[in-house]
Curated annotation (Swiss-Prot):
Gene: lipB
Boundaries of every BPL/LPL catalytic domain copy: 29-217
Name of the protein this chain belongs to: Octanoyltransferase
Highest classification ranks of the organism: Bacteria, Pseudomonadati, Pseudomonadota, Alphaproteobacteria, Rhodobacterales
Location of the protein in the cell: Cytoplasm
Record pathway: Protein modification; protein lipoylation via endogenous pathway; protein N(6)-(lipoyl)lysine from octanoyl-[acyl-carrier-protein]: step 1/2
InterPro entries: aa-tRNA-synth_II/BPL/LPL (IPR045864), BPL_LPL_catalytic (IPR004143), Octanoyltransferase (IPR000544), Octanoyltransferase_CS (IPR020605)
Annotated site, Lowers pKa of active site Cys, chain positions: 145
Length: 220
């Protein structure tokens, strides 16, 4: 498996072309699986379920059609984007399990920083409860999204992946309704008061990956 960390900001079109080529190579047995960690310049992406009404400021940043699952999301500096190109044909062919493992990977990574990430029924991604914010009118803790997940499969090879908010400009999310959810906000590790660097997150991601996914099964 190739584990790649790109410096600088990678244009979205370049990343998409690289993913497309790598997915084809993996499916044809010409290349190993790949995990690609990068940052994008500020942009919005629209998944296959995106509602145009959720793009509330269409002129703010470039908007790209992503052809992944999900709705609108934001990518930009300070956010760790992780493109996950795994051969699910050799890992069980279970899409639901794959998405659950993506969530579990993020949750384990956050736990390295003593942050409790949680799943929520009907809301893909990873959420944190905000003890530091006023409770809702119903007396419940507010919840903010810290990581988004959106994937696609081609010939049982995954691509696209996840993003974790490390230290992005959270105001940049205001041009969309993130993931179509209006009643919850977004947060980041730094917003939660943690002096975490991108390099710290990268180390935690790699440590937790094999614990969550395991190595590629060896064919007999």
């Amino acid at each position: 498996m190739d584990w790649i960390i790109s410096d600088g900001l990678v244009p979205y079109e370049d990343a998409l072309a690289t993913m497309e080529a790598r997915v084809a190579a993996i499916s044809e047995g010409r290349a190993p699986e790949m995990i690609w960690l990068l940052e994008h310049p500020p942009l919005y992406t629209a998944g296959t379920s995106a509602d145009p009404a959720d793009l509330t400021d269409p002129d703010r940043f470039p908007v790209h059609t992503a052809r992944r699952g999900g709705q609108y999301t934001y990518h930009g500096p300070g956010q760790r984007v992780v493109y996950v190109m795994l051969d699910l044909g050799k890992r069980g062919r279970d899409v639901r399990q794959f998405v659950c493992r993506m969530e579990a990977w993020v949750i384990a990574t956050l736990a390295e920083f003593n942050v409790t990430g949680e799943r929520r029924e009907g809301r893909v991604g990873v959420w944190v409860q905000r003890q530091d914010k006023p409770r809702t009118a119903a007396g419940q803790l507010q919840e903010d999204k810290i990581a988004a997940i959106g994937v696609r499969l081609r010939k049982w090879v995954s691509f696209h992946g996840l993003s974790i908010n490390v230290e992005p400009d959270l105001d940049h999310f205001s041009g969309i309704v993130p993931c179509g959810i209006t009643e919850h906000g977004v947060t980041s590790l730094v917003d939660l008061g943690l002096p975490v660097t991108m390099a710290d997150v990268d180390v935690a991601l790699r440590k937790c990956f094999e614990e969550t996914f395991g190595p590629l099964p060896v064919e007999a």
